[in-house]
């Protein structure tokens, strides 16, 4: 239900390597609208596009009360919009999960190029794991395999559900998985059995790596873009022998979490938002990086400019470059 004119809005922005998500909540933390965009290697342009689209979707007079950013480019997005809160993906995903399923104990989150597992007890994060090195099981790998099999990524999950005799696929490495799939095709196995075999392999790989040593207890939530794939949901349910819940807005949970955190921050702070306004969608931002030689660490420092002026720097082990 769209907010009425004059409604208070909290905006969350989640900028990842593959997708950029925005979510707008009302003062009662109900989702007003959301956006799911491909980052395409252009995080600044996608944040600006998202802001333009969101500005057009919100009714005239809706007041922005707080903005939060998260994701791998959270600092960049936060500087661009002057965010009120900048939080890591673990916190944002967990906050959104607890908001929708208060008794959640395990969150499986698989994005475009990384994956996470979050253990929650009594609404508090007690442990987590991340995999940002290997692409096996991520959305980008599934995209590649769908293209190779000449299947639309949207149809991959439905095809996996048709499998009755899934084949065993080596899922520890993307290279081995792909070669194994080719071998199974050449051996005459049905495509749906290969596809679901891949889903099972990727789910096992996730649990044996990201979930290694973790106590996975229900309720289990599956968040992130890969949760669109019903074959992956089926695979996790089969391996874990428990129901896996896919939240209605699973693909934008990070952005929802950032908006919830912004609402919480503004309630504590009590003053106005730092948000620069939707006009930043037309601003001329630029970025660059350099290697700091102040000590043997040789940190790579990222910096963002607006009209040639440095707005912020980050990435060092100390704060020598953060004092702009």
Regions found by a protein language model. Give the residues of each.
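Acidic, glycine/GT-rich loop-and beta-edge segments that sit at the periphery of enzyme/chaperone cores
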Residues: 264-324
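Gly/Thr-rich phosphate-binding beta-strand-loop-beta motif of the actin/hexokinase/Hsp70
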Residues: 2-28, 104-121, 165, 291-295, ...
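Glycine-rich phosphate-binding loop plus the immediately following alpha-helix
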Residues: 40-44, 122-165, 173, 264, ...
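Glycine-rich phosphate-binding/hydrolytic loop that grips phosphoryl groups
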Residues: 95, 142-143, 248-278
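Conserved phosphate-binding/catalytic loops in two-lobed NTP-binding clefts
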Residues: 84-90, 237-256
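Adenine-nucleotide phosphate-binding core of ATP-dependent small-molecule kinases
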Residues: 177-208
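Short glycine-rich, Thr/Ser-proximal phosphate-binding strand/loop in the N-terminal lobe
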Residues: 7-45, 49-53, 128, 132-133, ...
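Glycine-rich phosphate-binding loops at beta-strand->alpha-helix junctions
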Residues: 71-73, 212-239, 250-254
């Amino acid at each position: 239900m769209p907010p009425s004119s004059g409604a208070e809005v909290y905006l969350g922005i989640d900028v990842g390597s593959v997708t950029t998500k925005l979510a707008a909540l009302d003062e009662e933390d109900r989702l007003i609208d959301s956006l799911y965009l491909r980052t395409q290697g252009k995080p600044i342009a996608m944040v600006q596009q998202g802001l333009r689209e969101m500005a057009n979707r919100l009714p005239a007079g809706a007041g922005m009360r707080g903005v939060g950013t998260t994701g791998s480019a959270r600092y960049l997005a936060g500087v661009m919009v002057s965010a009120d809160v900048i939080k890591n993906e673990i916190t944002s995903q967990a906050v959104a999960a607890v908001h929708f399923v208060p008794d959640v104990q395990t969150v499986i989150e698989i994005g475009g190029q990384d994956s996470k597992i979050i253990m929650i007890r009594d609404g508090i994060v007690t442990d987590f794991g991340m995999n940002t090195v290997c692409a096996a099981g991520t959305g980008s790998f599934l995209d590649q395999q769908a293209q190779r099999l000449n299947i639309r990524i949207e149809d991959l999950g439905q095809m996996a559900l048709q499998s009755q005799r899934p084949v065993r696929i080596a899922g520890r490495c993307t290279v081995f998985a792909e070669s194994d799939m080719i071998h199974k095709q050449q051996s005459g196995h049905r495509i749906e059995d290969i596809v679901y075999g891949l889903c099972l392999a990727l789910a096992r790989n996730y649990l044996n790596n990201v979930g290694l040593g973790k106590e996975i207890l229900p309720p289990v939530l599956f968040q992130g873009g890969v949760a669109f794939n019903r074959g992956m949901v089926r695979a996790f349910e089969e391996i874990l022998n428990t129901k896996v819940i896919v939240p209605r807005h699973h693909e934008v949970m990070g952005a929802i979490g950032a908006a919830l955190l912004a609402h919480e921050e503004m309630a504590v702070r009590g003053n106005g938002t730092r948000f620069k306004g939707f006009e930043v969608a037309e601003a001329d931002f630029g970025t660059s990086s350099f290697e700091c030689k102040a000590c043997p660490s040789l940190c790579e420092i990222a910096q963002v400019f607006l009209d040639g002026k440095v707005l912020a720097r980050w990435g060092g082990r100390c704060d020598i470059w953060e004092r702009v």
